[in-house]
Amino acid sequence: MKRIFLTFLLLLTSFSVFAFDFGGILSTTSYVQDSVSNLSFNQYVESSLWMRANLGKNTTLTSDIFYSFNGDFANEAELQAGKESTFINKLDLSSLKLTSKFNLENNSSLNLSLGRFLINDFSGVVFAQKLDALALNFVTENAIVNFYTGYTGLLNQYTVSMFSPKFVPDANPFYTFATPYIVANVSVKLPVLFASQNLGFELYTALDAKDFSYNRIYSGISFDGPIYKSLYYALTSTFQFNLGTYPEKSNFGNLTKAEISWFSGVKSFILSANATYLSDSFTPITSTDVLSDGSDLDSVLKTGIFASVKPIDKLFVSLGSDFVFDVAENNSIQDYKGFQYSAQLRYQLFDDVLLNFSASQIFYNQQNPAYQNQEPYLNLKAHIRISF
């Protein structure tokens, strides 16, 4: 009895020293997509458990374990073509991150992160995913310097999507290793450099860890800041250089994103105009959809407007539209591809229940020979998330 009491007392003492919190998320997502006459249905059921422990004043450990069941149901046309419905179970350690902060002189600090966590480049496009990495973040009054290096080959191919022209993953249940890249990044941000403007530089490398034949170097620059009162801009441009032996159409590529946003200050209303340009040979590390039909980021110019508002505290509404153009092999604007729209409604039903509905559709230019017989592509999504 005395041992049980001492053990219980020790546990209470440990939790008082190391603050501990945990919780979970249950969600279901339904997709209806493809041309209106050939719609397909996908169902995702997901659950995750997370925990956070403060291991002292400046050290934190966080983790997130994820399970998902995905059903891709073949429609009638796909069944006639020989395709069957597929069902995939996914199990993943979404994140495991140890973070420590070291306070230095002159209001400077050094932050160390180790484990598996999300990484984003300036554009949010080139590399926007999880990474098993070591990261250093040095912060001063005049500059922010970031460095990280990591490996993608231990990630779950079912939960990340990376571009590789030759990697074929194993068809293992639950977990299969992803495309193996050795990734490194160094970036410098100069906040409020002049006239409240922010400037940033970054350099990325992605080396093919399998045979070093498909290698990438990315160099990026970013500008952002106020133009006048509530009017702001953001500009990023990333240049890609191909260094491997894998045959390429071109050894150079470019991604440029520009946005001007007006913050009204009323009901969180934001109105923005944006443009995204990708040259013919640009290939990011993370495979990201750029159009409503699921097209990858490749050889496209997209320009449009976007608006969002919170008419009441728990409701978020957004609406956007874009004109899309193909980019030719010489990187000039080639042909008008089509027009797309997107809409989203997100409602916080209760503190722990979130409802999210979205719709998007692209209408192809029927006068363009490349899309003469393509029907409009529709994408509908309904998502319910319960937190506990």
Q: Model-predicted segments: where are they?
A:
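Signature for the C-terminal beta-barrel architecture of outer-membrane proteins
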Residues: 21, 60, 104-111, 120-121, ...
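Surface-exposed loop and membrane-interface regions of Gram-negative outer-membrane beta-barrel proteins
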Residues: 33-45, 53-112, 118-128, 243-250, ...
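Short glycine/proline- and aromatic-enriched beta-strand/turn motifs that initiate or cap beta-hairpins
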Residues: 20-42, 274-276
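Flexible internal linker/loop segments at domain or repeat junctions
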Residues: 283-300
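Outer-membrane beta-barrel "beta-signal"
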Residues: 374-388
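Positively charged n-region of N-terminal signal peptides that target proteins for export
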Residues: 1-4
